[in-house]
């Protein structure tokens, strides 16, 4: 999950400050004590999102690393970036920023036959198409998990035709895709585990490697929950025409990559489960803190290594319903009558939060960047909302309430996550009132309705 390794990176920043202190320069606030600088750095790093944390992480590496001992990789030439193959897999991914027609061509290739879609519709599935997009948010993903479980217990949660996930949302999405039978696992993942179950400190990685933390605990958690039986369930649902997409970021190309996890699960390749797990880990990989995930591809018979990291670096939440509009409105699919519905779970607060800002460089930078990031996330919501207005899709938004005031004593504090899970659960179990437009767009929504 994005932010899982936050504490490790903060420790690395502390090390940088100690280094600067010994060298006699570079202090953030010469009038304050060094301890205060460290405390300010902790607060600064705690609030930064993956895309902008990268700059601080890079700074720490530049200041402390004389050389790296990372194993060399065979980098894919820029000219071949659009010609890659993954051995044993076909049509399993697309660029998230590609033209809709190109994406649609990939998604429609080898689609299940009409009789499979009709069989799905016959399983008492509502005639309306339901889409779900789950954002990242680190430990705040507990809100989305609780919301989904409470929604199930309210008896109103639909089966989703399309589910997308990024970062912590990527770890929620497969369970949401499979349905309420997996709610127990969702509850477990976001209430049973803490920081030590997610990562271990690896300060030596600043000097010797590509990461500040060891992601082995998180990888083991993914392996625990994503087993062969789990993959078979995903494959069965994909055969019915349902779609699960997970987003990663290709660092070499600076582009979002969307993975069709159902097609990976349907593959007969023995490495399908390995790739499935890798993609979940990559989507949750905060760059510079966790090591990037290498994914081997082939071009012209030669093997190359791509570097994939947190999907939230390029998209905090994503959906592309227009790509699937032909299927959503196809009468043969059993979903041609009612208006499709999109549900967006934003694992974070979208309301302004007041805070007294100290007049020093750290506080000013901290507040400015956290404000920028919050508004970037809202910008993603605007983009999605505009697509739904264009394509005639009902927009529904959930986010952490402004009055949720529980705080964490440490990253991934179980007490905090349990409280947030229960808040999401309580809201959904009492018939949650979904917001019909992003902040500031309510009047536009009312004018069109």
Identify the role of each PLM range.
Residues 34-55:
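Bacterial N-terminal signal peptides that target proteins for export
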Residues 55-65:
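Bacterial N-terminal signal peptides
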């Amino acid at each position: 999950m994005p932010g899982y390794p936050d504490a490790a990176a903060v420790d690395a920043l502390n090390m940088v400050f100690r280094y600067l202190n010994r060298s006699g320069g570079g202090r953030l606030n010469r009038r304050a004590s060094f301890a205060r600088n460290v405390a300010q750095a902790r607060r600064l790093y705690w609030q930064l999102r993956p895309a902008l944390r990268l700059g601080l992480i890079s700074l720490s590496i530049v200041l402390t690393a004389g050389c790296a001992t990372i194993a060399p990789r065979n980098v894919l030439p820029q000219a071949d970036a659009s010609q890659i193959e993954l051995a044993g897999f076909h049509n399993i991914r697309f660029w998230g920023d590609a033209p809709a027609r190109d994406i649609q061509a990939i998604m429609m290739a080898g689609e299940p036959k009409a009789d499979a879609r009709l069989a799905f519709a016959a399983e008492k599935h509502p005639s309306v198409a339901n889409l779900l997009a789950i954002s990242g948010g680190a430990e705040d993903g507990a809100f989305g998990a609780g919301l989904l479980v409470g929604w199930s217990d309210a008896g109103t949660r639909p089966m989703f035709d399309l589910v997308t996930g990024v970062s912590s949302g990527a770890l929620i999405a497969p369970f949401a895709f499979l349905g309420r039978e997996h709610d127990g696992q969702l509850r477990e993942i976001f209430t049973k585990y803490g920081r030590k179950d997610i990562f271990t400190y690896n300060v030596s990685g600043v000097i010797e490697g590509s990461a500040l933390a060891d992601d082995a605990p998180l990888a083991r958690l993914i392996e625990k929950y994503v087993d062969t039986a789990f993959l078979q369930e995903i494959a069965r649902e994909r055969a019915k025409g349902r779609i699960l997409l997970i987003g990663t970021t290709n660092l070499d190309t600076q582009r979002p990559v969307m993975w069709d996890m159902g097609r990976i699960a349907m593959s007969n390749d023995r490495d399908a489960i390995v790739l499935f797990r890798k993609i979940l880990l990559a989507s949750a990989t905060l760059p510079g803190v966790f090591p990037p995930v290498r994914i081997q591809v082939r071009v012209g018979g030669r093997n190359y290594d791509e570097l994939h990291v947190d999907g939230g670096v390029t998209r905090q939440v994503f959906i592309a319903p227009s790509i699937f509009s032909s299927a959503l409105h196809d009468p043969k699919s059993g979903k041609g009558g009612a208006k499709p519905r999109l549900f967006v779970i934003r694992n974070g607060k979208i309301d302004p939060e007041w805070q007294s800002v100290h007049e020093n460089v750290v506080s000013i930078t901290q507040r400015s960047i956290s404000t920028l990031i919050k508004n970037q996330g809202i910008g993603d919501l605007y983009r999605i909302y505009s697509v739904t207005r264009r394509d005639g899709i009902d927009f529904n938004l959930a986010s952490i309430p402004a009055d949720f005031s529980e705080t964490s004593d440490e990253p991934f504090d179980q007490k905090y996550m349990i409280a947030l899970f229960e808040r999401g659960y309580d809201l959904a179990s009492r018939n949650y009132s979904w917001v019909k437009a992003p902040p500031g767009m309510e009047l536009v929504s009312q004018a069109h309705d």
